[in-house]
Structure formats: structure tokens, C-alpha cells
């Protein structure tokens, strides 16, 4: 958006920034200046001339010979090709030797010339040839008040035009008034004065059928206007920001748009059938817009119509048929508030954007509609003549202000600042956001209510006001400070809904949750239990029993995915399993005591461990991958230290948790980890190994310990030692790990790094070698060799006495 500094000074006469200071300050306020255009005065040899005579060029149809009075006593002959030259026009004349710099940046010097056989001593200039605008439709026409022979620079002013990038949340800054509000205190803004217009209601001039899309609409009929070129000052204002003047009526609406940010539209009143305006959203017809493109209007688009057809797309663009022309004598001036969502939808559907839609889409000031209309009417009466025949309004203007509360302590907490409450009030008052209370604000106040003006549509809540305080106070004035982190006591309670907590952990472990039907086929359930709960009247063989656990349901999901080409799976489910109770375990609570319902967490993995890649061999997941997942789950529940993994058979290990309740310690069976056997895989039609784990949710919740106990890192070095034991094959390696950890508190961690099984030798007991890597550390000091040897001796002695394990001899 282009902003003229001279235009800004109409609103802020005291504006004292130099160009670089203004650019820096606007950017600092969040209105980034993308480019700066310095508009300089033309060469002194460009003077004011008056065309006295125009005659055709004898040798060229498109050229004309102009005799121009430049105040030198003799008329100057100039050959000109502009289509708009006429006798009596005041024009800029570049005399011999004048150096011109065009808008394009090209520089050229005027020299005597002979054009198609006719002498030409100078050039009648268009605005773009003088570097004043990009208008090249004809020569530049000057006011009659200009004195012949005087340098044109005398009647022009230097200006600086800023190209500002306005963010979507700041539609209030899409005008010169909006930018002026940023540069000066609210009370320093000078608003142009215009007579108050009394808009009547119910006169029949307006009918709004879609009040949601157009809550407020005004129409003013002005008769007896004279449409013609705009005064030089008005045309110059528009040229400075890159707009091409058209005629005085259209130029006034554009001037109001860029001054106040309120789009207006003028219709030729005699082209409106029925002399009335209807705003509706059910039109379905073709429409020729001002850009001479035909659009197909659809129901749902906000359209302004006369008694017969659409004459404008509401908030977007007017129609060509009702446009103001040189023959127009009576106009209808529209000033309205269109719903941003409605304009955005219509503009997007039609792929049509305009200066008006750009502002309506983002939100114009609803309280500015009437004032902008009044000022436009005053300008039209002054410049184009005529008189107001009627002025009518429909609907009500939205509320003028919003009330938003601000807590000074919250501001300083967010910004890391120490701004006083009274300073915050003063900062916000600069941009017309005023405290509701008229009393002086004390610095220890808890909350302050502010009245937000209607043009700040982006301010809805406290954090928006905090942003404004930071912006006005200056981000560069915020002193760097340590990050303040609020400290809250760690809750030791069980999460409000424990199954959801388990779900969040599993998702964090890269598993996908599935939801399955608890009713399954009997053949599938038989693979996992004989104590099945049968459905009395099953609707199909697929739904004849309740699942005893979640395994059959998960395996069905695995099979479905494999048949559809998805063979790498990590799935889990938290749900219920159902089994019959043995007679001995039933209570006396009624028929339901014959059944046992358990809440379970089940998980399966299958397929490749990692995606296929050129730099590594394919490896499938195995039993230990799933065991690792279970260990991570137990660790997050703070249960790993209390858990033990016991081998049930070659394919299954059990998970047991040591629990202490009421002073009694017990070992509870929490679940299993297993490789699904081949017979079960065949039942479910699976052709690759699947690994399954199942845990009792109720038991996990009972044993769960919330909270993280912080353990600071040791200040002293860690010592590593390796031990290789030979132990009977039937003893799980986990027992050796647990025993090593329990031997001495200075044993920080134990892990297996090698296993060697030499097989069975006749006449000798069956043994295997398990190599352990131990990390030792003492929090009270550095361990010397004597201390290290003592710990290692304890581990070796305990392994020998408890497990019959001996150190492997090399």
C-alpha cells in the first residue's frame, strides 16, 4: 500500500520525521516499509504554457501541430501526438535544454527537432514523462490559475511515497488516516470537517434483503453534478500513490478510500431501473463489471441490484452499465458496511479482487461509514456542484466499541518487563484505546478495563492489548532478563483417566491405536482361552463369543493390513476382555459373578525394523524389540525397577511386578510378552512372525507411581568393567543382571554385550556364557582400584552363591 507523506500531513500537520526516521519508526511499529519513492520537482526549464491553436499535421494523421504561448512574446510551435490536446489547455512545456527523468528512470534532454517535416521546439509533457505518475493517456492538464511562463515546479511539491506492507490483522492501517494514528497521539489527529447529513429511513430508496451480509447501507442521491476532470490538487494526490485520475466523482471516491479506508461507489442515478437499490444474495445472472469482464453471479453472492438487474458486486466492484460518465448529471453515492466473510467468499468465487474488497475482506471501521459519506458528499458539492436530493440509511451500525480488560501484572509476566500500570494507560491512550474509568489508575491495580475503538477489529482479548503495550513501549526497550519459569509441585496422583495416559505413552512410542469389536468368531477365541463367554443369540458366526483378551482382535487387524499390502505394523488397543470364572473363583454377587471382565493393554509388532534402504540389510523385528517397548512403558510408569521378566517357555516370558500394600509385599502377574506360534498365525491367515504383549491395566494403575524423582548427575567419573560368566542354560540372563545390580549401590547399570552358547556336551552340564558390561560410580568420590575390586568381588561372589555362575576362563 502506497502512502504519501504530504497526504499524511493533512492529518498530522506536526509530523516532523525525516524520511529515514519515518521509515524506521513505521517498521518499528510493525508497518514494514518495503520501498521508498522520492518524487522530485521537474527541471526549471519545464514551464507552464497555454495551447493557443491546434491544427492537423500535414504529413501524419496521428500528430498535431500546437501553437503554445510560453510567455516569451512569440508562440512556440510544438508537434504533439497526445489525443487530448485542445486549444485553451494549460500544459507543462519542456523547453529546449530541459532534462527530464521519466517514471521508468530514463533520462533524456529536449532538443530542437523536425518531426515529419515540421519544426518542433520543445515537448508538451505527460505526467509520466515528468516522473510524476505512470499516466501516459494524454498530456498533463494544469489548473487555469497557473501563470504562463512560470516554472512548473512552482506549482508542485516534493513528496515521499512509502510502500508499506500491512499485515492481514491490521486493516485499520490501510489508509492515510490509519497510518497517521500510528504516528501521532490520538488527540493530535486533525479530522477534516464536513456538514452532518441526516439520513432518513424507510423512504423506499433502499431495500436490504440480506442483512447478515450487509448490516448497514446508506445511499445519497445528488442531482445536478457536472462530471469532468478533477482539480489539480486532487488528481495530484491520486497520482502520488499510483492511481490514474478518471473524473471528479470517481476520483473523490478513491480519495476517500485512501484517506479514511472506507470504500464508496457512485452510480449513474438515471441508469438505475426503478430508482432504487436492493441488496440481495439470490441473484443468478451474468454481470459486466467496471473492468469490462463478464462474471457469472451465483446464489450466495452479495449483489447490489436495481429494480431489474445487478448493478454492483457488493463490496467488490461496480457494474459498467451504471458507471459515472461525462454525461452523468445525477448520481447515487453508496457507503456501506459489508460482512468481511461474505465479501471474501464472493471475491474468491469470482477470482476478482479490488481496492474495496481488499479492505472489506479484512474489516473496515463500521463507525466510519457515515463520516466518510458526509465528507465525500461535501467534496462532490464543492467540486462537481449539484445538491443533495435525498439521503437514506438501512440497518444499524455495529457497536462503536468493545471492552477488554488488562492485568498489568500479566503484561509484565509476558514481556519480562516492569512497566507501571499508569504507563500502560498512557501508551494505549496514544492509539485511542482508553481506560473506561475516568479516575487515575494506581500502579497496584489488579485489572484495568479499556474501551477499544471500532477501527481496531484485531483487538479481541487481553493478549492483543499486551502486544500493543509491547509495540508502543518498544521492543528495544525491553531489558533482557532470565526466563521466569513457574514452578509447580509434581503431582503424585494417578492421572485422571489412566487408560488415556497409557494411550498417550503408546502413541509416543510410535504405535497406532486401533478400536475393534469385542465380539469375534469362536475359532479365533479358542486359540487363547477355553473359558469363553458365548452370545446366546449371535447374529452371525463372526460375532458368536466375547473375546477372552485383545489378542484375537489385534491379529485380525494385522491380517487385514497384510492383505492390503501393509506389512510393517506397530499397533495397540486398550479395551476389555471377558472370560468365565472357574466355579471355585465365583462369588455370591449374582449371575454376573460367573464372568470376569478385565481391562487390558495389548500391542503387536511385525515386519521390518526399519524402512528398506540401500545402505543396510533388511532386519525384521523380533521378540526383544517388543520386550524393549514394554520396558520403556514400565519405565514411564516408574515400575521398571519393581518388574521382573520370567521365562515361561521358549516363546513367552511373564511380567511380574512387586507391590507393597498395607505393609505386605506381594509379586503380581502383570502380563506376558510372546511370539505368536505358527498354529495361531495360520488361523488368522498370517504368513510372517508376529510378536504380542498384553498387560493388565487395572494392575498397572494400582502399582503406578506418578512423578519424577530428580537424581543429579554424578560429579565423579564412571568406571566400566566387563565380566564374562558361565552359568547353567536354564537360568535366565535377567536374573544375573538383577543380581549384579543388587550387589552394591555403586553398580549404576548392567547390560549384556555378548552371549555364547557352546551347546550340550555329553557327560557335562548344559551351560552358556553371558558377558556383562558394568558401570560403577560413587557419588561421594572417585573410585580407586581397591573400591572397584571390592564391588567386582561382590558381584562374582553373589553370582556363584545364588546362581552357580563362575567367571569364564580364557
Curated annotation (Swiss-Prot):
A matching Pfam family: B5
EC number, UniProt record: 6.1.1.20
Predominant place of localization: cytoplasm
Cofactor binding: number and manner: Binds 2 magnesium ions per tetramer.
Enzymatic reactions: tRNA(Phe) + L-phenylalanine + ATP = L-phenylalanyl-tRNA(Phe) + AMP + diphosphate + H(+)
Highest rank taxon of the organism: Bacteria
GO BP terms in the entry: phenylalanyl-tRNA aminoacylation
Keywords in alphabetical order: Aminoacyl-tRNA synthetase, ATP-binding, Cytoplasm, Ligase, Magnesium, Metal-binding, Nucleotide-binding, Protein biosynthesis, RNA-binding, tRNA-binding
Domain FDX-ACB: 714-808
Sites where the protein binds Mg(2+): 458, 464, 467-468
Keyword presence, 4Fe-4S: no
Domain B5: 399-480
Family: Belongs to the phenylalanyl-tRNA synthetase beta subunit family. Type 1 subfamily.
Subunit organization: Tetramer of two alpha and two beta subunits.
Name used for this protein in its record: Phenylalanine--tRNA ligase beta subunit
Originating species: Chlorobaculum tepidum (strain ATCC 49652 / DSM 12025 / NBRC 103806 / TLS) (Chlorobium tepidum)
High-level lineage: Bacteria, Pseudomonadati, Chlorobiota, Chlorobiia, Chlorobiales
Amino acid at each position: 500500500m502506497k502512502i504519501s507523506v504530504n497526504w499524511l500531513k493533512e492529518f498530522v500537520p506536526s509530523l516532523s520525521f525525516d524520511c529515514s526516521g519515518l521509515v524506521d519508526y513505521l517498521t518499528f511499529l510493525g508497518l514494514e516499509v518495503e520501498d521508498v519513492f522520492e518524487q522530485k520537482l521537474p527541471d526549471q526549464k519545464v514551464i507552464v504554457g497555454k495551447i493557443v491553436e491546434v491544427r492537423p499535421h500535414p504529413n501524419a494523421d496521428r500528430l498535431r501541430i500546437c501553437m503554445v504561448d510560453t510567455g516569451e512574446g512569440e508562440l512556440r510551435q510544438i508537434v504533439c501526438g497526445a489525443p487530448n490536446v485542445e486549444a485553451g489547455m494549460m500544459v507543462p512545456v519542456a523547453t529546449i535544454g530541459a532534462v527530464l527523468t521519466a517514471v521508468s528512470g530514463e533520462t533524456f534532454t529536449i532538443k530542437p527537432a523536425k518531426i515529419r517535416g515540421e519544426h518542433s521546439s520543445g515537448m508538451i509533457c505527460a505526467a509520466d514523462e515528468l516522473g510524476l505518475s505512470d499516466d501516459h493517456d494524454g498530456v498533463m492538464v494544469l489548473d487555469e490559475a497557473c501563470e504562463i511562463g512560470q516554472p512548473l515546479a512552482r506549482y508542485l511539491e516534493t513528496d515521499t511515497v512509502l510502500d508499506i506492507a500491512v499485515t492481514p490483522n491490521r486493516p485499520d492501517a490501510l489508509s492515510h488516516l490509519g497510518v497517521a494514528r500510528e504516528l501521532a497521539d490520538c488527540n493530535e489527529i486533525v479530522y477534516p470537517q464536513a456538514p452532518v447529513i441526516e439520513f432518513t429511513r424507510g423512504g423506499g430508496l433502499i431495500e436490504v434483503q440480506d442483512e447478515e451480509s450487509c448490516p448497514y447501507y446508506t445511499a445519497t442521491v445528488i442531482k445536478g453534478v457536472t462530471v469532468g476532470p478533477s482539480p489539480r490538487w486532487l488528481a495530484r494526490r491520486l497520482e502520488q500513490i499510483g492511481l490514474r485520475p478518471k473524473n471528479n466523482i470517481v476520483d473523490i471516491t478513491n480519495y476517500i478510500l485512501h484517506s479514511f479506508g472506507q470504500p464508496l461507489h457512485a452510480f449513474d442515478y438515471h441508469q438505475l431501473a426503478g430508482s432504487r437499490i436492493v441488496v440481495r444474495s439470490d441473484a443468478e445472472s451474468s454481470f459486466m463489471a467496471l473492468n469490462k469482464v463478464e462474471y457469472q453471479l451465483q446464489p450466495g453472492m452479495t449483489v447490489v441490484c436495481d429494480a431489474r438487474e445487478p448493478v454492483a458486486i457488493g463490496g467488490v466492484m461496480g457494474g459498467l452499465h451504471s458507471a459515472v460518465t461525462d454525461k452523468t448529471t445525477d448520481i447515487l453515492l453508496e457507503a456501506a458496511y459489508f460482512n468481511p466473510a461474505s465479501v471474501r467468499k464472493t471475491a474468491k468465487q469470482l477470482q476478482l479482487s479490488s481496492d474495496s474488497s481488499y479492505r472489506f475482506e479484512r474489516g473496515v471501521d463500521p463507525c466510519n461509514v457515515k463520516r466518510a459519506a458526509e465528507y465525500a458528499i461535501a467534496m462532490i458539492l464543492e467540486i462537481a456542484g449539484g445538491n443533495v436530493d435525498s439521503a437514506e440509511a438501512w440497518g444499524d451500525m455495529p457497536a462503536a466499541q468493545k471492552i477488554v480488560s488488562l492485568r498489568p501484572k500479566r503484561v509484565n509476566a509476558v514481556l519480562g518487563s516492569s512497566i507501571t500500570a499508569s504507563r500502560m494507560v498512557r501508551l494505549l491512550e496514544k492509539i485511542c484505546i482508553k481506560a473506561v474509568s475516568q479516575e487515575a489508575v494506581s500502579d497496584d491495580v489488579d485489572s484495568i478495563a479499556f474501551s477499544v475503538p471500532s477501527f481496531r477489529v484485531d483487538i479481541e482479548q487481553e493478549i492483543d492489548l499486551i502486544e500493543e503495550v509491547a509495540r508502543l513501549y518498544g521492543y528495544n526497550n525491553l531489558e533482557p532478563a532470565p526466563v521466569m519459569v513457574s514452578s509447580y509441585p509434581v503431582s503424585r496422583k494417578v492421572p485422571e483417566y489412566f487408560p488415556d495416559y497409557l494411550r498417550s505413552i503408546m502413541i509416543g512410542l510410535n504405535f497406532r491405536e486401533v478400536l475393534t469389536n469385542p465380539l469375534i468368531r469362536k475359532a479365533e477365541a479358542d486359540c487363547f482361552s477355553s473359558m469363553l463367554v458365548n452370545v446366546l443369540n449371535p447374529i452371525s458366526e463372526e460375532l458368536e463369543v466375547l473375546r477372552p483378551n485383545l489378542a484375537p482382535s489385534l491379529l485380525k487387524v494385522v491380517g487385514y493390513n497384510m492383505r492390503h499390502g501393509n506389512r510393517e505394523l506397530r499397533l495397540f488397543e486398550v479395551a476389555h476382555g471377558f472370560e468365565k470364572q472357574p466355579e471355585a473363583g465365583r462369588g455370591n454377587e449374582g449371575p454376573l459373578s460367573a464372568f470376569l471382565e478385565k481391562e487390558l493393554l495389548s500391542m503387536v509388532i511385525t515386519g521390518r525394523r526399519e524402512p528398506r534402504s540401500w545402505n543396510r540389510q533388511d532386519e525384521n523385528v523380533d521378540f526383544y524389540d517388543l520386550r524393549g517397548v514394554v520396558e520403556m512403558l514400565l519405565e514411564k510408569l516408574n515400575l521398571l525397577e519393581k518388574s521382573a521378566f520370567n521365562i515361561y517357555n521358549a516363546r513367552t516370558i511373564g511380567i511380574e511386578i512387586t507391590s507393597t500394600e498395607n505393609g505386605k509385599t506381594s509379586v503380581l502377574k502383570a502380563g506376558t510378552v510372546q511370539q505368536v506360534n505358527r498354529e495361531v498365525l495360520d488361523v488368522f491367515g498370517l504368513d510372517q512372525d508376529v510378536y504380542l504383549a498384553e498387560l493388565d491395566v487395572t494392575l498397572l494403575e494400582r502399582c503406578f507411581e506418578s512423578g519424577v524423582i530428580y537424581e543429579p548427575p554424578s560429579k565423579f567419573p564412571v568406571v566400566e568393567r566387563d565380566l564374562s560368566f558361565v552359568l547353567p542354560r536354564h537360568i535366565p540372563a535377567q536374573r544375573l543382571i538383577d543380581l549384579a545390580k543388587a550387589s552394591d549401590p555403586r553398580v549404576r547399570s548392567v547390560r549384556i554385550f555378548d552371549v555364547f552358547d557352546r551347546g550340550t556336551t555329553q557327560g557335562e552340564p548344559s551351560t552358556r556364557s553371558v558377558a556383562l558390561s558394568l558401570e560403577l560410580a560413587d557419588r561421594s568420590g572417585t573410585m580407586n582400584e581397591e573400591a572397584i575390586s571390592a564391588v567386582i568381588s561382590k558381584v562374582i561372589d553373589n553370582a556363584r552363591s545364588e546362581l552357580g555362575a563362575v567367571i569364564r576362563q580364557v
